[in-house]
Amino acid sequence: MPNWLLPENIADVLPSEARKIEELRRLIIDNFHLYGYELVMPPMLEYLESLLAGAGHDMDLRTFKLIDQLSGRTLGVRADMTTQVARIDAHLLNRASITRLCYCGSVLQTRPNGLHATREPLQIGAEVYGHGGLEADAEIQELALASLALAGFTQVRIDLCHVGVLRAIIASDVQAQKDENALYTFLRAKDVPALQEMTLTYGADTRRALLALPGLYGDVTVIARAREILPKLPGIDTALDELIALAGLAGETSVTIDLADLGGYQYESGVMFAIYVPGLPNAVARGGRYDHVGEAFGRARPATGFSMDLRELARLLPDAEPKLAIRAPWGREPALRTKIGALRKAGEIVIQSLSGHENDQDEFECDRVLVLEDGNWIIKNLG
């Protein structure tokens, strides 16, 4: 096997793509700061039990594991940063007030999330801790849409769901409670035949409601249909009320309701959303409420947030034009060094030519040149 081959769904990021990613990261992180979010940087790996606390079986399957040579304990390489940030809020910051945190870093996953997806996403996201009301969910939804707008994605669709619907349906059926994980899997895949077979021994109302969920998809009128079809349970009524409220706060953004889109069900506790852009089957951003994750770290706090993959977003953007730069000769003369330093301080890209490589600049377009005239270094236009 050639030494330059990488594992499947793992890839290097080359200069033009890296520039798009970094510029986008700066835009989004700076915008988070304008909303009052503080940046945190969790470690790449942790003890496995801490990393998976409250995260569910699906996250366990997606996590790479290794043995710590110092302690002999099992470590996990983070596959998602959400629980790490929840640990920071619950255990390290330990604030009583509302806390807004943001983050950006690479995660590593045993399997890709979708066709042609990377197993090393560059995850960026934001979380609000300490407020259980819809105001926090609305802020996170607004921030996610604003982040995508900064990347140039304004024609997006937000897909809303609520885990409270499924949990209310199965709460009164003992057999359904035993099959909760399988039901989640079948509903997420909209596998109606499997649902029909699994629910044969359930109560009639439970079975009817579960089989209806995959078809409860469409615009906001789906909520009215759900009120007619689903059992009259307080948990369902509350969930549908929250969905209609958040749908009304989306402004001009296209909104769909999908009561079977249960990504993250195992640790989410309320509203969930996924945001899609035209021409791409997978969501570019996902978020929702997860009030119980902090319990694993000894401090339950209301929490809601979202995340997205910067590498995926950058891949969707058009190739950037080469940066304009100034070409300068190589030299250590004090006057030349002073002039180059002043230009760089002013924000100009100045590239010093090495002997025999004066025109070798793939990533930059040198439209000006620094020349010595009458004892002064001046800039002249090229072409």
From Swiss-Prot:
The highest taxon in the source lineage is Bacteria
Q: Where is the signal peptide?
A: none
What does the UniProt keyword field contain? Answer: Amino-acid biosynthesis, Cytoplasm, Histidine biosynthesis
Q: What is its main location?
A: cytoplasm
Q: What biological process terms from GO does the record include? A: histidyl-tRNA aminoacylation; L-histidine biosynthetic process
Q: Name one GO molecular function term.
A: histidine-tRNA ligase activity
GO cellular-component term (any): cytoplasm
Associated pathway? Amino-acid biosynthesis; L-histidine biosynthesis; L-histidine from 5-phospho-alpha-D-ribose 1-diphosphate: step 1/9
What InterPro entries does its record include?
Answer: aa-tRNA-synth_II/BPL/LPL, HisRS-like_core, HisRS/HisZ, HisZ
Q: Where located?
A: Cytoplasm
Quaternary structure annotation from Swiss-Prot or TrEMBL: Heteromultimer composed of HisG and HisZ subunits.
Report the HAMAP family cross-referenced here.
HisZ (MF_00125)
Q: What does the function comment of this entry state?
A: Required for the first step of histidine biosynthesis. May allow the feedback regulation of ATP phosphoribosyltransferase activity by histidine.
Q: Which family does it belong to?
A: Belongs to the class-II aminoacyl-tRNA synthetase family. HisZ subfamily.
Q: Which NCBIfam families match?
A: PRK12292.1-1, PRK12421.1
Its UniProt miscellaneous note says: This function is generally fulfilled by the C-terminal part of HisG, which is missing in some bacteria such as this one.
What is the protein named? Answer: ATP phosphoribosyltransferase regulatory subunit
Q: What is the organism field in this record?
A: Herminiimonas arsenicoxydans
